[in-house]
Structure formats: structure tokens, C-alpha cells
Design a protein with these regions (language model features):
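Glycine-rich phosphate-binding loop of ATP-dependent small-molecule kinases
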Residues: 1-271
Length: 271
């Protein structure tokens, strides 16, 4: 059984749990973003996943309470123009180095296109995508050596859930633009993409830049898991524990009791 097959895609949160945890981690991330600025550190967050897996929704919740001067989101599509004349990592280096005033840089799709869509669709040679695992690991190692933290998310949904989301997009006028013929064609290659994803997770999850696999059939659960993972990764890297706004609010209430928030460490790709 593969890693993706072992995921429990039924994991979910109730509305009160979602509202509570979303507030908690958004406020904590805002505090941590200020610490990144003070310490001249940066965070690189990568979101990959199936079409309609929720990358954009996760990124919106991640940035919702951040100072817009301190982050930038890079939506990545197929290379065009000058980008096509260089090594595939060139266009990403241009965005990341030299560091500017942005503490948080977020990629909606990324350099992993080389070992995902380019591999499956035959846009590069087999030698090229096999070589890319080492190139990507070296690339991310250089980012870490330059003072960045790297967090990477694979958002996993089932074929059935993806179909539901496609049909909803098709039936909703203001969402219809998101659905393309290519999205439907990609569904026919689900197994080949699964194989590429498994190889990617196995070969590019490192101690310094681990993958987090996010069960995303239920959007509320996936959003909170991503936010929590980012907060814990930055908190650990900075050795700084942000205040918990939920506990502080409870403590201010008559008879309220303040508890201690749990803490989770990073590691290899996990669910």
C-alpha cells in the first residue's frame, strides 16, 4: 500500500473547531511574521496538489491576517518567453534571491512541475526528471543555507471529491473560468500522477525541507492543518512560542482557565 493510499481522507472539523483553530493559527502566524522581520529570516511555502485540491483557498487563509507588505504569492504556470531559454530553476531563483523585504514567499505550484506534470505529460526527458530530484534537493538546501525555512504541502483529494468540485465549478458562473479541458484530461492519468507524487515525496522530503501531506477532501481540516504546520515550523526554527489568542480569551472570561497549547515537531512526509 502506498503512502497516498494510507491517508484518511475523511478527516474533518466541526464549524466551531474550524473557527477556533483558524483564528488561533492566523493570529499566531501574524506574530511570527513580525519575528521573521526582526530576525531577518524568511519562509518559503510551497503548495502542490491535484487540480481543485484547494491550493488557492489554503493560501488565502494563510495570508488573511498578514501585513501585505511582508509576503508575496507566486502563481506558477508553464514557463514562457525568456524563462524557456534557461534552466527550469532559473525563474524561481529570480523570485527568491537576492532576498528583499518579503518575509514570506508562497508558491501556488512550483519547481516540482518538473517531476510532476512535465514527467507525466512527457514535456521533458526521463533523464531530465530523474536528475531533477537531486537538483531540487540542492536548490532547497541552498535556500535553507541562506536563512530561509522551507515548508512544502501536498494537498490530496480523492477522484470522487475532485469530480464533485469540477462539477460545482462548471455549474457556478463565476468559478467556471477555473475549469479547463486540461483538467479533465489530467483525471484520465490519475494513476500516473499518483506514481509521480509518490516518487516526489519519497525522494525530495528532507530533514531541512520536509513534505507535509494534507488530507484535503474536507477543506476546513486541510486549511487548519496547513496553518498549524507553518506556525509550528516557524516557531521551532525561531525558538519562539507565540501567544495563543484562544487561551488568552478563555482566561479573561469569568472562571476561565488557561491551558497549554500542544506542540508538534517537524519531520519526514507525514499525514
Amino acid at each position: 500500500m502506498t503512502m497516498l493510499e494510507t491517508l484518511d481522507l475523511g478527516r474533518r472539523l466541526s464549524r466551531p473547531e474550524y473557527d477556533r483553530d483558524l483564528l488561533r493559527y492566523q493570529v499566531q502566524l501574524r506574530e511570527l511574521a513580525w519575528q521573521l522581520y526582526r530576525r531577518k529570516r524568511s519562509l518559503v511555502a510551497v503548495f502542490e496538489g491535484r487540480d481543485a485540491a484547494g491550493k488557492g483557498g489554503n493560501i488565502r487563509r494563510l495570508t488573511e491576517k498578514l501585513d501585505p507588505r511582508g509576503y508575496e504569492v507566486f502563481p506558477i504556470a508553464a514557463p514562457e518567453g525568456e524563462d524557456q531559454t534557461h534552466h527550469y530553476l532559473w525563474r524561481f531563483w529570480r523570485r527568491l534571491l537576492p532576498p528583499d523585504e518579503k518575509q514570506i514567499m508562497i508558491f501556488d505550484r512550483s519547481w516540482y512541475g518538473r517531476v510532476l506534470v512535465e514527467r507525466v505529460e512527457g514535456f521533458c526527458t526521463e533523464d531530465a526528471w530523474k536528475r531533477a530530484y537531486r537538483e531540487i534537493n540542492d536548490f532547497e538546501r541552498q535556500l535553507v543555507d541562506a536563512g530561509a525555512m522551507v515548508v512544502k504541502f501536498w494537498l490530496q483529494i480523492s477522484p470522487e471529491e475532485q469530480l464533485k468540485r469540477f462539477e460545482k465549478r462548471q455549474d457556478t458562473a463565476y468559478k467556471r473560468w477555473k475549469l479547463t479541458p486540461e483538467d479533465w484530461r489530467n483525471r484520465e492519468k490519475w494513476g500516473r500522477y499518483d506514481e509521480a507524487v509518490e516518487d516526489m515525496l519519497l525522494r525530495t522530503s528532507t530533514l531541512t525541507a520536509p513534505w507535509t501531506v494534507v488530507e484535503s477532501n474536507f477543506k476546513w481540516f486541510g486549511r487548519v492543518k496547513c496553518l498549524k504546520t507553518v506556525v509550528e515550523a516557524v516557531s521551532k526554527a525561531l525558538d519562539y512560542k507565540p501567544a495563543d489568542p484562544v487561551i488568552e480569551t478563555q482566561a479573561r472570561k469569568p472562571g476561565g482557565k488557561a491551558g497549554k497549547p500542544g506542540k508538534k515537531t517537524g519531520g519526514k512526509p507525514h499525514a
